[in-house]
């Protein structure tokens, strides 16, 4: 396509300008965004701007999720991208849109993150943990087809500031506990299923647990 990349951004109406593309084969090298199963992408320009582009025409025809490609991912990026996957799973489940299959996929992804992200951070060569995190990332993106929430609304806005140089996953990790406390009175009994997926006791403070989880990572 001709013209500045910004012309194809979602906020500039680029979605309608993006036509059919050659078949895309996505090969992720992190476990967080889930872009390999989505029709969107983020391009960071030379001046630090983050351009969000999305279209059904960008949906990959094939995703090759090979955990071997994530074995060398540094601890900080393993943790940050993993928390991005967690935020996707939780926010997709909590959004008011009704989509039981997507909710179930998100909860399964959340269970994987809680179980395997600490292992992947502790030992980057843990292939089993890396595989489960790749699955969690893909599940998170499948689930958020039904929507996201305040965590991503804020992290995208803050992360777009080129002066901050803030990682999207790190922002999600920091914002998630506060948003969970804010949402608590408005989501009915959904936190009951969240606790079960996370292996927490009934009545446990999910926001506080995630704060501690962040510290451990």
Q: Language-model segments: which ranges?
A:
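Mobile late-domain/C-terminal helix-loop "cap" segments
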Residues: 177-217
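Glycine-rich phosphate/pyrophosphate-binding beta-alpha loops
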Residues: 32-33, 138-167
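Glycine/threonine-rich beta-strand-loop-alpha-helix active-site module
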Residues: 1-68
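Phosphate-handling active-site elements
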Residues: 2-11, 162-169, 185-186
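Short helix-capping/linker segments at secondary-structure and domain boundaries
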Residues: 3, 93-99, 148, 181-189
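Carboxylate- and glycine-rich phosphate/diphosphate-binding segment that chelates Mg2+/Mn2+
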Residues: 39-146
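Gly/Ser/Thr-rich active-site loops/lids in small-molecule metabolic enzymes
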Residues: 100, 160-175
């Amino acid at each position: 396509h001709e013209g500045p990349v910004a012309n194809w951004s979602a906020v500039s109406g680029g979605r309608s300008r993006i036509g059919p593309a050659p078949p895309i084969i996505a090969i992720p090298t992190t476990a967080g965004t889930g872009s390999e199963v989505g029709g969107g992408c983020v391009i960071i320009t030379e001046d630090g701007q983050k351009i969000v582009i999305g279209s059904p025409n960008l949906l990959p025809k094939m995703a090759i999720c090979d955990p071997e490609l994530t074995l060398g991912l540094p601890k900080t990026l393993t943790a940050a991208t993993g928390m991005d996957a967690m935020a996707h799973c939780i926010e997709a489940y909590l959004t008011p849109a009704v989509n039981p299959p997507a909710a179930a996929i998100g909860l399964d992804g959340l269970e994987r993150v809680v179980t395997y992200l600490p292992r992947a951070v502790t030992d980057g060569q843990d292939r089993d943990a890396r595989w489960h995190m790749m699955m969690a990332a893909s599940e998170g993106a499948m689930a958020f087809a039904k929507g996201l929430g305040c965590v991503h609304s804020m992290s995208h806005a803050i992360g777009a500031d080129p002066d901050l140089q803030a990682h999207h996953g790190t922002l999600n990790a920091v914002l998630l506990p506060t948003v969970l406390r804010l949402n608590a009175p408005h989501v009915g009994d959904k936190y009951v299923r969240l606790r079960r997926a996370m292996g927490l006791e009934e009545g446990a403070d999910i926001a506080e647990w995630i704060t501690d989880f962040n510290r451990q990572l």
